[in-house]
Amino acid sequence: LHRDSPLIDIRWLTSPATLHFAGAILLMRIVLAEQTVGASNFFQALGIQNEQTLPLYGIILCAILAGGVTCALLLRPGRENWFYGTALACVALGAWLDSGATSQTRPHDIWLSQALVAYGSGLFLPAAMAQGMGSAIVRGPLYILSFITVFLFTQSIGGLLGSAIFGTFITLRTSFH
């Protein structure tokens, strides 16, 4: 804390704006873990094999790429909040569409809902990265490492927490049925 140019600026990392940003992308990463853990564990619990879910994962990949392309074409400084809102709406709609899943649900039944979640993911992460990196660049090159530290930490911890939460939920729910 008492260096002229620290490798990682603790004051900036603990500022309200940075903590708000980190909290938001951490929560979004936890929510997005549903797609990687929830859907795959759900189908695994139903006895559906990997080759039966291959088209679903192809659709998810295409939707993520579409979200990234949309960001590349439309994202400009100051528009990030629009992307956040749209991403959240896509994820919420996809989750709502999946809320009626039963033991009769098959991978083709959730193509649209999982595509919406994937598209939302493709919209959110590039916009968050651009906003955070822009904020770090404005402050100077030393803040870039601090931003990368925050971003990678939140994505790693969020993915682990999300996997643990959704995996535990699925295990508990399947033990009751």
Residue ranges of each PLM-predicted region?
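C-terminal membrane-cytosol helix-exit motif in multi-pass small-molecule transporters
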Residues: L1-R3
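12-transmembrane solute porter fold
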Residues: L7-S175
